Regions:
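The serine-hydrolase catalytic nucleophile loop
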Residues: 82-93
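A catalytic-pocket lid/entrance helix-loop region that shapes and gates access to the active site
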Residues: 170-213
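Conserved alpha/beta-hydrolase
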Residues: 95-114
Length: 220
């Protein structure tokens, strides 16, 4: 029986050694992903305020980097315009496990960024130039730059790609189509019926009057 016991010890040792090696590899990978020693935001939790030039002067927009991957960097474009990056915080449970470096970003007019009151700044082409300035400030290039846009962010992402496709490695669009009439039809026929009828009635009341800044409309 002794030889069998010896074989068991050897087998156990081999399994333990393999398991230890795998753990070491994963730990090393995680260390690289979390290494911010060469980043200029290393003492700021990944946060960077980026100055943006506009026809109405210079303003600052908020960004936050998570992770470190020189070959895959994703800039997240939120909806709105006027929404915030929080919609994407669920990505914290997915992207780090895949080693993806990603950037939260509040567009001009959103919560953590400057909020100028000049409505002429709410222009698609101007937002495209803003994204390009953010890209340059973050050091993203066509070797690693992926743009993710949802809803309004999808429109912005597509418009950016039409002008600056040479700067992109990839474009991901969520919950948006490249046609405003088609999206309006989808909104009227699919999204609107899911709302509470009374809420929808109020929304339509303010939209018919084009009273988009009404406090009640904003609450809805």
């Amino acid at each position: 029986m002794k030889p069998y016991f010896l074989y068991f010890l050897i087998y156990t040792f081999v399994l333990t050694a393999c398991k230890t090696e795998i753990k070491t590899s994963i730990t090393s990978s995680n260390t690289d992903y979390l290494d911010s020693s060469e980043k200029d935001d290393q003492y700021l939790g990944g946060i960077k305020m980026i100055p943006i030039s506009t026809p109405k002067g210079e303003f600052n927009v908020w960004t936050k980097r998570v992770g470190n991957n020189p070959t895959m960097k994703v800039l997240l474009l939120h909806g709105g315009p006027g929404m915030t990056h929080e919609i994407y915080e669920s990505f914290d449970g997915y992207f780090p496990n895949e080693g993806i470096e990603y950037y939260y970003y509040d567009q001009l007019g959103s919560y953590y960024s400057d909020q100028p009151t000049d409505l002429s700044l709410w222009d698609l082409d101007r937002f495209v130039e803003e994204v390009e300035q953010v890209r340059v400030a973050l050091g993203l290039s066509n070797d690693n730059f992926y743009l993710f846009g949802q809803s309004w962010g999808g429109i912005l992402g597509m418009q950016y790609a039409l002008k600056y496709q040479e700067n992109l490695k990839g474009l991901i669009i969520s919950n948006m189509v490249p046609s405003i009439p088609d999206y309006q039809k989808y909104s009227d026929e699919v999204l609107a019926p899911k709302l509470d009828p009374d809420v929808l009635k109020e929304i339509m009341f303010y939209e018919d009057k084009e009273d988009y800044t009404n406090a009640r409309y904003m609450d809805l």
